Amino acid sequence: MLYRRWGSDKDFVISYTSSNESDKEIVEEVKLTLKAHVIELYLSNYISKDTAKKIIRAINSFKDYPSSGYEDVHEALEDYIIKNIGEEGGWVGLGRSRNDHVATALRLRTREYIFDIMEELYLLRKSLIEQAKKNLNTIMPSYTHFQPAQPTTLAHYFMYLEEELNTPWEALFNSLKLINRSPLGSGAIVGSNVKIDRKREAELLGFDDVLYNTISSTSSRIDFINAISSLTLLMLVLSRFAEDMILLSSMFVNIIKLPDSHVSTSSLMPQKRNSVTMEILRTKVGECYGDLSSLMMIYKGLPSGYNLDLQEMNKHYWNCIKHVIPSIHITRDIIQNIQIKNFGEIQGLTATDLAEEMAISGIPYRKAYIDVANKIKAGTFVAGISYTKSIENKKVIGSPNPSLLTQEIEIKEKRLNNQHEKFKQYKESVIEKMGQLGVIEDGLLQQ
């Protein structure tokens, strides 16, 4: 044990407080963070070029993260460096704390995950728009209170989902910018006597800026909770979609046919088409909300400053995050392959059309409404309008009217393309800034 100079060195105590398992997620980010720190020590004239070179080479050669014997990856990495290059390796501890380094590594890893998720979310929204274009005239019933309401189209339903997913997109992009602030150089809580250029370190790691207050830098996890909250918004939309698919594909409703690849049969009952992927998706959403709840429950009672409780939050970040991309993939595949079945006359689906036509012709709407309701109750209602005509008559913005919906699709497609371009530019700026670290590292190692 490199750091444990007080307390027990018994294996069961060390393993109880160790973060080794969750640290496996951030090994590369911890190495990257330490390299930025070593480069900063060199650029600030605290260590020689030769020492910096030796340390960076040792960092790069750290491949096999031991599963035991250390409190965390930071201790394992520093011990590895010292064992490989001698006491000179101990310079990595100058102006550094695990508190600011783990916070930095967590932000780097989360940033990469958000990059990946937003790219997948873009593809999902793009698929919704593309499928909406193809299904402007694919008629289906809409539902309120899960009772048949009025005729609509599959395109209208797809554009509803696209609109719902716009909110998580905006929330995620905002979360990304909050995550992309650097804690590095904050020390344990109040900074360090070592005159580290925190802004230069931030630039090397692709951050937008530093997270200024050093108490916040080292002990705040509010930006991570915010990011997970944004992801649960996304998963919430997917969960409602999953519920729609389960209900609408059931034999009781039988409006939608799910792709064969997304259903399975029973081991006993050969007629079954169980919507298994949608059932699992609902479960993953529940797990994400459990993770968010755990994060808030851990965080709510902590005094300011770093507490080891914070390391127990890490596993909940990764658990939720790792459910998101597979859930998006499953959703996109269903959207691209869904089929609406032919369905017959649904009693009363155009009842509102008749009541509104009567009102437009001069009868007060409530009187027309009661008249139509009485006909439905007596079983004498006759639909005087086709589903297609009913949809065409809805000439209000946001309706399933094909002409208006085509205009909406064009507007939403332009919005999505603009959002994606803005996101790409942001991601490219991060990559470009991080290139400086590689240039400096290469320069050191080649000399």
Swiss-Prot record:
GO biological process: arginine biosynthetic process via ornithine; L-arginine biosynthetic process
Broad class of where this protein is predominantly found: cytoplasm
Coiled coil regions, renumbered to chain: none
Catalysed reaction, written as an equation: 2-(N(omega)-L-arginino)succinate = fumarate + L-arginine
GO cellular component, one term: cytosol
Enzyme Commission designation: 4.3.2.1
Alphabetically ordered keywords of this record: Amino-acid biosynthesis, Arginine biosynthesis, Cytoplasm, Lyase
Metabolic or biological pathway, per its Swiss-Prot or TrEMBL entry: Amino-acid biosynthesis; L-arginine biosynthesis; L-arginine from L-ornithine and carbamoyl phosphate: step 3/3
Compartments it resides in: Cytoplasm
Lineage: superkingdom: Archaea
GO molecular function, one term: argininosuccinate lyase activity
Keyword field contains Disulfide bond: no
Positions of disulphide bridges: none
Pfam families listed in its UniProt record: Lyase_1
HAMAP family found in the cross-reference section: Arg_succ_lyase (MF_00006)
Record PANTHER family: ARGININOSUCCINATE LYASE
Protein family according to the UniProt entry: Belongs to the lyase 1 family. Argininosuccinate lyase subfamily.
This protein's name: Argininosuccinate lyase
